[in-house]
Each structure stands twice: as C-alpha cells, then as structure tokens.
Amino acid sequence: MQSAKQKISDMASTAKEKMVICQAKADEKAERAMARTKEEKEIAHQRRKAKEAEANMDMHMAKAAHAEDKLMAKQSHYHVTDHGPHVPQQAPVPAPAPVMGHGYGHNPTGVTSVPPQTYHPTYPPTGHHNHHHY
C-alpha cells in the first residue's frame, strides 16, 4: 500500500515540477520579448534556469520525503512498543539556499561542500608492502 502511495506522490511531485518548468519557460519567453539588449535576454535565460533547478530540487526533496514516509510506515509495523510517550522526530534539515554565482560548484567564502573529517587516508598505505611481480 505504501509503495503505491509513494508512486502516486512521486508522480504528483514530477507533474508539479513539469508545471513549474513550463511556467518558467513561458516567463522567459515573455521577458525575452520585452528585452532590448543581449544582456537582458541572457538574464531572462538564467532566471529560467534557476527556476528549473529550484523546481528539480523541490521534486527530489519531495521524493526523499515520500521514501522516508514509506520507510517509517514499514518500520512502525516491526517496532510496536508501549514503553512510554512517543517522542517526535526532529524536523528535516532545510536545503541550503541556492547560491547565485558564476560557476557550477563554487561555494561562498567559508562554506565547504565536504564535511570536516579527522580521518585522513594515505595512499599507498604505510607499512610493509607485498609486491607480487609476475
């Protein structure tokens, strides 16, 4: 039952994304028609791309939420306990605001896309090496 519910929810999210993309394309067409310079036309194009990316991100966030709902429903059948009051789960962490920059994958100063780690692997690993030459 949850699989069907997830599929329907995913289809609704995809349809919403396609609708937003279609609206963004129509907005771009109207902006380009009113634009007088090449730069204004490029700005309209970039706005459309940003709207499409945001719609795509929203769709994927919704699909992740649907998968989480399915998992929680599946797990709740296996973990039936009456050991006290239900403790609500933490709210999901909101997605970071999109960075409007000049390049793909660039982060603002002080922000990294890689979480800090204490483990620093080395290659080749230190120690005795058995090299087999055939």
Swiss-Prot record:
According to the lineage, what is the superkingdom?
A: Eukaryota
Low complexity bias: start-end ranges: 115-127
Give the UniProt keywords, A-Z: Coiled coil, Stress response
Positions of region (Disordered) = 31-53, 80-134
Question: What Pfam families has UniProt attached to this entry?
Answer: LEA_1
* Coiled-coil segments on the chain, per record: 34-70
Question: What does the UniProt function comment say about this protein?
Answer: Involved dehydration tolerance. Involved in the adaptive response of vascular plants to withstand water deficit. May possess chaperone-like activity under water deficit.
Example of a GO biological process term = response to osmotic stress
Q: Does the keyword Metal-binding apply?
A: no
GO CC, one annotated term:
cytosol
Q: Which gene encodes it?
A: LEA6
Q: What is this protein called?
A: Late embryogenesis abundant protein 6
Sorted alphabetically, which InterPro entries does this protein's record hold? LEA_1
The biased composition feature labelled Basic and acidic residues covers 31-45
User: What is stated as this protein's family in its record?
Assistant: Belongs to the LEA type 1 family.
Organism, by scientific name, is Arabidopsis thaliana
What turns on expression?
Answer: By dehydration stress.
